[in-house]
Regions:
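Glycan-recognition and processing domains
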Residues: 46-91, 161-184
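A short beta-strand element within beta-rich, extracytoplasmic domains
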Residues: 92-106
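Short, surface-exposed beta-strand/strand-loop-strand elements in extracellular ectodomains
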Residues: 109-119
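Extracellular carbohydrate recognition and processing domains
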Residues: 119-143
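Short beta-strand-plus-loop segments that form exposed binding edges in beta-rich domains
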Residues: 149-156
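Activation corresponds to long, low-complexity, non-globular regions
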Residues: 164-222, 363-451
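Secretory/extracellular carbohydrate-interaction modules
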Residues: 185-277
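Carbohydrate-binding surfaces in secreted/extracellular proteins
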Residues: 299-333
């Protein structure tokens, strides 16, 4: 009887344990399913939209009545005059609806107007401390850059810092200059720089680089640098410096690494050993340091200019760099300068071109150039045509602070384009091929060039 009782008790205990185990498994399963469903719901809620804060410090430009500084050092834009118009830019990767707001404050009470295309909204600001004020909903019909125009309304002075963008559009991606890390507000307002690295023959010592640039009419705003002949130790091209001044610029970096030319030891300084008429010689800094030369020259859009660079090691641990420039139609060659670089023993390497905006006030204005008839000459005097180029972009574009850049090949020339907030983005690393211009092979008597 006792044994039967013990067996019954044992069976009951086993059943109870099994039931407890089942219960634990059951509720654990429910909990896991609950977590999964919650995660899916959370993911779905995130994908359904978002909020982005577009800082004025890196994304706003004063466009009317004339370009100028848009913000103070704290990234605050002040609306004082109804005649002034400011434009803020951000990019979306698909059509969407956005709700816009502004982090703003006013002295007393003031108002301002926000517009995307023909859609407009006006708000009154009466708080003295910065706070977000939502303006309204706007329809964005296509992917790409969105321009938001801001103008002052009635009342007192109004300030704003951030443009607030909200949207319920699923998976929407918004790009803009996100922060000022690494002085990115400055670089972002300038815009992305793009480059073409040319394919040259391997295993050959190269002495000369030749190329031509044509800037289309209307694609030459102030602050443009159309760099034709870049090499491992410097660069050579033409600039738009102001409404009345244009330059041909040739620079060579010192082997001493510094952004302050005054820090360069005497034995590592770039030495000018020759210059052309009216060419000025000086120093440069901030992006490395070295020797710089420039000729004030009224080059014009729509015309083709040619550039020639010689890189010649002297056999004494120094290398001589010489550049010439000319109007192709005039069949002219002007000596720009000749520089000696110490602690250097090299032939031409790293042949490339680039397109740059160097004025942060005008980074909203686009530019474009055509680079063609590109050649290198080896130390035996043989010419080699450069028909292939690899495209690249600086970190401003590579890190998606700005997306308005592209490049490519059009028949017998390459092209580069940047700034202007156009809705096309090139692909870094892409290789372009142009058709040959062998029928335009340069005929240059190097020994007769001005030196």
């Amino acid at each position: 009887m006792v044994e039967r009782f013990m067996v019954v008790v044992s069976d009951i205990a086993k059943n109870i344990c099994s039931l407890a185990a089942f219960s634990r498994l059951f509720y654990s399963g429910l909990f896991a399913i609950g977590l999964l469903l919650f995660g899916l719901l959370l993911t779905e809620s995130v994908s359904l939209g978002g909020e982005w804060r577009v800082p004025a410090g890196g994304n706003v430009y004063r466009v009317e009545p004339e370009p100028g500084n848009a913000t103070n050092r704290e990234g605050v834009c002040t609306l004082k005059d109804a005649q002034q118009k400011y434009s803020i830019y951000f990019s979306v990767d698909r059509p969407c609806k956005v709700q816009l707001g502004v982090e703003t404050r006013a002295q007393g009470s003031g108002s301002f107007q926000i517009a995307i295309g023909l859609e407009k909204a006006e708000i009154v600001v009466d708080q003295s401390d910065f706070a977000d004020v939502m303006v309204g909903e706007f329809e964005v019909a296509a992917k790409g850059y969105v321009r938001v125009d801001v103008t002052k309304g009635k009342g007192g002075e109004v300030q704003f810092k951030d443009l607030v963008v909200k949207s319920d559009t699923a998976e929407l991606k918004v790009d803009y200059v996100r922060d000022n890390e690494g002085n990115m507000f400055y670089w972002g307002r300038r815009g992305p720089s793009v480059h073409l690295s040319y394919q040259v023959p391997r295993g050959v010592d190269l002495q000369y680089a030749y190329s031509e640039i044509t800037v289309p009419v209307g694609e030459d705003p102030i602050g443009s640098y159309f760099m034709a002949n870049g090499f491992g130790e410097g660069y050579f091209g033409m600039q738009v410096n102001s409404e009345t001044e244009r330059r041909v610029l040739f620079s060579v970096w010192s082997p001493f690494q510094t952004d302050n030319p005054k820090d360069i030891p005497e034995e590592q300084r770039i030495v000018a050993v020759g210059r052309g008429p009216e060419v000025r010689i000086g120093e440069f800094g901030n992006e490395g340091s070295g020797g710089q030369s420039f000729l004030i020259y009224p080059w014009g859009a729509g015309k083709t200019y040619r550039f020639l660079t010689e890189v010649k090691p002297e056999g004494t641990g120094t290398t001589l760099y010489t550049c010439w420039f000319g109007d192709k139609a005039a069949n002219e060659w002007r000596l720009i300068a000749s520089f000696r670089r110490p602690k250097t023993d090299t032939h031409l390497k790293g042949f490339h071109s680039f397109l740059e905006s160097f004025n942060p006030v005008l980074g909203y204005v686009g530019r474009r150039c055509q680079n063609g008839n590109i050649w290198v000459v080896d130390t035996k005097g043989e010419w080699h045509e450069c028909l292939q180029a690899r495209f690249s972009v600086d970190p401003t574009g590579g890190n998606r602070h700005r997306l308005d850049y592209t490049g490519g090949a059009e028949g017998d020339h390459f092209f580069m384009r940047n700034c202007g907030f156009f809705s096309e983005t090139g692909k870094a690393g892409e290789v372009f091929k142009r058709t040959s211009t062998a029928d335009q092979k340069p005929d240059i008597h190097f020994d007769k060039l001005p030196r």
